[in-house]
């Protein structure tokens, strides 16, 4: 099966078969990351620009490693070191970058929809590395890959997502992807951090009580409190938040015995989850980071026109 999209803007745009293709390719590419020499010539001669308007550690580093393991050339541009600080618009930045003939632009931007705007104005491929509160497709894919490795499937899983849903592009990508793959998503968080109508995105249940969301869950995914996006009225204190929506060993016992604990990072330890849980046997947080490289290799591979056998 060939991947038919020029860009990857969000999981909302992808079919179940396309998501499976990206996950299966990532699973195949993981083997490269275990070799002594972690490089294949698949994207030799391709140029990838990582254009980040927001701070990032895991995503930007992971995309750069993914590109280099496929032998692509990478250029990293951050807003703080670019002409953006001089007032250059996204449109002008895009046209100037495009004039240098890149093959793929990987972009993170604070404004939801920025990637749609960019993709309409450039001829090269665009991959969304996070746009506002809209989507973070690579995170959603790596989360699903991590779950599938543990349970062998996504269909029928109960996945609890707890935290700041309003500002979370990770939550939205997981909702789109997981519900398309047959999982049931349960959401919990403070009422001020739960957007109205979120349940209309798929097979989603909104719970007022965190306990209801995580009871008998296969996966408990905790989200970071995005302090940089909070208004004064959304979060009284971190202590109060942790009291009602923080995960500890006692609460984790409500989930299934073999439940996974996940977090997209960075973690606010002692707020959304305690260190005992973050570093415990049920934590798959570092496995998520590990899988991120393979997933982003898969995304780069497929928007470059790669095709794998269906079997």
UniProtKB/Swiss-Prot annotation:
It is an enzyme of class 2 (transferase). GO terms for cellular component: cytosol. Carbamoyl phosphate binds at residues 58-59, 108, 136, 139, 265-266. Pathway: Pyrimidine metabolism; UMP biosynthesis via de novo pathway; (S)-dihydroorotate from bicarbonate: step 2/3. Its EC number is 2.1.3.2. Catalyzes the condensation of carbamoyl phosphate and aspartate to form carbamoyl aspartate and inorganic phosphate, the committed step in the de novo pyrimidine nucleotide biosynthesis pathway. The lineage of its organism: Bacteria, Pseudomonadati, Thermodesulfobacteriota, Desulfuromonadia, Geobacterales. PROSITE patterns: CARBAMOYLTRANSFERASE. Heterododecamer (2C3:3R2) of six catalytic PyrB chains organized as two trimers (C3), and six regulatory PyrI chains organized as three dimers (R2). Keywords: Pyrimidine biosynthesis, Transferase. GO terms for biological process: 'de novo' pyrimidine nucleobase biosynthetic process; 'de novo' UMP biosynthetic process; amino acid metabolic process. PANTHER family: ASPARTATE CARBAMOYLTRANSFERASE (PTHR45753:SF6), ORNITHINE CARBAMOYLTRANSFERASE, MITOCHONDRIAL (PTHR45753). L-aspartate binds at residues 86, 169, 224. One of its GO terms (molecular function) is aspartate carbamoyltransferase activity. It catalyses: carbamoyl phosphate + L-aspartate = N-carbamoyl-L-aspartate + phosphate + H(+). It comes from Geotalea uraniireducens (strain Rf4). Belongs to the aspartate/ornithine carbamoyltransferase superfamily. ATCase family. The keyword DNA damage does not apply. This is Aspartate carbamoyltransferase catalytic subunit.
């Amino acid at each position: 099966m060939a991947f038919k999209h020029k860009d990857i803007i969000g999981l909302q745009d992808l079919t179940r078969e396309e998501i499976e293709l990206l996950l299966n390719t990532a699973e195949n590419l993981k083997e490269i990351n275990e070799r002594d020499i972690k490089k294949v010539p698949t994207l030799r001669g391709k140029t990838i620009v990582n254009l980040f308007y927001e701070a990032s550690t895991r995503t930007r580093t992971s995309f750069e490693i993914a590109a280099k393991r496929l032998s692509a050339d990478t250029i990293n541009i951050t807003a703080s070191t670019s002409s953006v600080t001089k007032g250059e618009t996204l449109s002008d930045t895009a046209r100037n970058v495009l004039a240098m003939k890149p093959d793929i632009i990987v972009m993170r931007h604070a404004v939801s929809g920025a990637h749609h705007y960019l993709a309409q104005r450039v001829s090269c491929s665009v991959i969304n590395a996070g746009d506002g509160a809209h989507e973070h497709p690579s995170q959603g894919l790596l989360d699903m890959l991590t779950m599938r490795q543990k349970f062998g499937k996504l269909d029928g899983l109960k996945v609890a997502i707890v935290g700041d849903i309003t500002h979370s592009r990770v939550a939205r990508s997981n909702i789109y992807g997981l519900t398309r793959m047959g999982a049931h998503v349960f959401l919990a968080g403070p009422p001020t951090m739960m957007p109205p109508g979120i349940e209309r995105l798929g097979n989603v249940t909104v719970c007022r009580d965190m306990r209801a969301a995580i009871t008998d869950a296969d996966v408990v995914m905790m989200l970071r409190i995005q302090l940089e996006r909070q208004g004064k009225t959304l979060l009284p204190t971190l202590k109060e938040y942790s009291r009602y929506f923080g995960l500890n060993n006692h609460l984790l016992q409500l989930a299934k015995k073999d439940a996974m604990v996940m977090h997209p990072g960075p973690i606010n330890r002692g707020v959304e989850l305690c260190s005992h849980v973050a570093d415990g046997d049920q934590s798959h947080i570092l496995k998520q980071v590990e899988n991120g490289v393979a997933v982003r290799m898969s995304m780069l591979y497929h928007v470059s026109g790669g095709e794998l056998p269906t079997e």
